[in-house]
Amino acid sequence: MELSEIRNLLEGYSEKINGFRDSLDLDRLEEEIALLENDMAQPEFWNDQAAAQKVIDESNALKAKYDNYQAMNTMLEEAQTMLEMLQEEADEDMQVELEEMTTALGQKIESYELEIMLNQPYDHMNAVLEIHPGSGGTESQDWGSMLMRMYTRWGEAHGFKVEILDYQDGDVAGLKSVAIRFVGRNAYGFLRGEKGVHRLVRISPFDSANRRHTSFTSVDVMPELDDSIEVEVRDADVKMDTFRSGGAGGQNVNKVSTGVRLTHVPTGIVVQSTMDRTQYGNRDKAMAMLKSKLYQLEMDKKQAEVDELRGDQSEISWGSQIRSYVFMPYQLVKDTRTGYETGQISNVMDGEIDGFINAYLRWNL
């Protein structure tokens, strides 16, 4: 990397970091952190543990924003100093170090930009992602299992705790439905753009004639509400069914009815949880999912988008697709909203979907 190229990069990074400073309002940010720390120092702080944890989480998030900004600013100053020294006297080792620092700074800035883009009210929350194959039988159900693998790999690679809440086996292969919980800060913010219909084009391994098939699978994403948001659900409005349940692939089938299915009669929303060992645990998880769906339903009504959040999307077909995954006759994954695309389809199916997530966040600003 030439020094002139490094200089141009650092000038661009400097503009971005100055923009971060303006958007963050550092003085106000420092005041907010100080106020929260003062609250945490009070003797009665832990009297309400749920409220205390919320304050701690907010404080940690603000500190992370502040510390990350300061770290980027320090890196920029060090890089600028090294550049000045190299312009006066060449030093091969120092130039290699500067190139590495410039690359690392660019990566930090990109990550920080994403953090700033996660500015919706529920972006910081955990997420529940549901996969529902459309019509197409085994081929569509196998596509659902491929998406499940893609998302779980993405979550694990990014340090999220990934938990299967409910899993229903496909008739021959794949799955009929799955609900996956992602635990970690900003899980919903990163995943909310994955909601929609995902289209697969490939030569089906289940077709003896080796014909090309097109399959559709619906992905739904909702925030997992915390205790700060109350959703009232009347007992009279909920029908509960219990059934025997087992893990993915038919493992550990229970001899008692631990699986729980909840139906919200007024809206027709159905949720279920099967992966906990107890009926009580599955009921709690199913109720949390139901509350999230009801809350999101109300939010979508205000935005005139209620049809997208009634448990199952109305039609899993061409019209509502957000992304196409083409294996044959060529290899390409393309997002129909942002235009972002890649030919590295194997990497995408292994969970490398950051490019699509980042492109959506920028597109949706």
Curated annotation (Swiss-Prot):
Protein name (record): Peptide chain release factor 2
InterPro entries associated with the record: PCRF, Pep_chain_release_fac_I, Pep_chain_release_fac_I_sf, PrfB
Q: What does this protein do?
A: Peptide chain release factor 2 directs the termination of translation in response to the peptide chain termination codons UGA and UAA.
Q: Which UniProt key words apply to this protein?
A: Cytoplasm, Methylation, Protein biosynthesis
Q: Where are the transmembrane segments?
A: none
Subcellular localization, per the record?
Cytoplasm
Pfam families from the UniProt entry: PCRF, RF-1
Location of N5-methylglutamine modifications: 251
Q: Which Gene3D superfamilies match?
A: 3.30.160.20, 3.30.70.1660, Release factor (1.20.58.410)
Family recorded in the similarity comment: Belongs to the prokaryotic/mitochondrial release factor family.
Query: How is this chain modified after translation?
Result: Methylated by PrmC. Methylation increases the termination efficiency of RF2.
**Cellular component terms (Gene Ontology):** cytoplasm
**What GO annotations for molecular function exist for this entry?**
translation release factor activity, codon specific
Main location, first listed in the record: cytoplasm
